Amino acid sequence: MSLLTILLDGTAAAGGAIGAGFAAMGAGIGIGQIGKGAVEGIARQPEATNDIRANMILAAALVEGAALFAIIVGFLAMVL
C-alpha cells in the first residue's frame, strides 16, 4: 500500500467518526430543545398536557430517526 492510500483510508475513517459524533450531538441538542418547548407549553397551558406530550414524542422520534440515518452513514464511511 502506498502512503497516499493509507492516508486516504485514515481520513475517511476520521471523517465518518466525526460525522457520526456530530449527528449524535445534533440529535441530543434537538431533543433537548423539543423537551424544553414541551415543558414551557405545559407550564403555560396545563389543560393541553396530553396533546403537547403526544406532539413532543412524535417530534423527538423524527429527530432520532434522522440522527440514526446520519450515524449509519458515518459508520459506513468508516467501513467502506
Where is each model-derived feature located?
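Hydrophobic, small-residue-rich transmembrane alpha-helices and their short perimembrane loops
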Residues: M1-L80
